[in-house]
């Protein structure tokens, strides 16, 4: 009932739900949980998000692979389709784009198994994530893609408070300024913690777990 709905400036088919409260991500404490579940799981909404992101990313010379973080594979598949509709080139011999998801090891580093490595090594990659609050996950993901021999061409996120990371513009459908009052803090500086207000939930790119 406390949920607030915010629509994208580019499309009235694309909306995120924000729930006010006290939430913890792996890197920060935030005063809104940004729920983009429907954008990731409903086909028509995912397709529209992909269309908006494709417009925002603009022209990319080569796209071979889209690396999907936080359960964004459905959006990633439609984003690949958007690129293939245009005059984008690919170095893939089969002339179609890979859509892959990494595993994360115990140190939260990207892990691509041997059967997936060929879709990264020497390939032109677009990194797609769901929600970016500090940019640390994007930073680690860029490091991982580089480690496996991929060349990142663009970075996209459905929601991001970060405009740039490691020299890449973060192309996002929603930014912090689209959510009036949204704030992220370090755990040490969190005003809720200082007042002794308990956490409502722990959140990550996949969703939330109430405490």
Language model features with spans:
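Short glycine-rich phosphate-binding loop at a beta-alpha junction
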Residues: 60-72
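Short, glycine/charge-rich flexible loops or terminal/linker lids adjacent to PRPP-binding catalytic cores
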Residues: 73-126, 133-137
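Active-site-facing substrate-recognition patch
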Residues: 1-62, 205-211
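Conserved acidic residues
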Residues: 63-64, 123, 153
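Short, well-ordered alpha-helices that flank and scaffold nucleotide-derived cofactor binding pockets
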Residues: 55, 81, 85, 143, ...
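Short amphipathic alpha-helix with an adjacent loop that forms part of the alpha/beta core around
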Residues: 57-59, 113-119, 187
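Hydrophobic Val/Ile/Leu positions in short beta-strands of Rossmann-like dinucleotide-binding domains
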Residues: 68, 127-128
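PRPP-dependent phosphoribosyltransferase catalytic core
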Residues: 1-9, 142-211
């Amino acid at each position: 009932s406390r949920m607030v709905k915010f629509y994208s400036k580019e499309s009235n088919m694309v909306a995120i739900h924000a729930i006010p409260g006290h939430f913890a991500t792996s890197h920060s404490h935030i005063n809104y949980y940004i729920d983009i579940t429907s954008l990731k799981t409903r086909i028509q909404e995912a397709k529209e998000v992909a269309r908006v992101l494709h417009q925002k990313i603009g022209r990319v010379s080569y796209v071979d692979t889209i690396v999907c973080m936080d359960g964004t594979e459905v959006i990633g598949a439609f984003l690949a389709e958007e690129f293939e509709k245009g005059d984008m080139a690919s170095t893939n011999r089969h002339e179609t784009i890979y859509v892959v998801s990494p595993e994360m090891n115990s140190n939260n580093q990207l892990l691509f198994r041997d059967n997936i490595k060929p879709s990264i090594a020497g390939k032109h990659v677009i990194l797609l994530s769901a929600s970016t609050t500090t940019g640390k996950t994007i930073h680690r993901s860029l490091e991982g893609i580089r480690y496996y021999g991929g060349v990142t061409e663009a970075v996209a996120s459905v929601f991001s408070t970060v405009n740039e990371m490691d020299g890449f513009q973060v192309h996002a459908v929603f930014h912090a300024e689209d959510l009036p009052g949204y704030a992220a803090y370090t755990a040490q500086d969190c005003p809720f913690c200082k007042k002794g207000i308990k956490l409502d939930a722990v959140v990550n790119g996949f969703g939330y777990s109430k405490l």
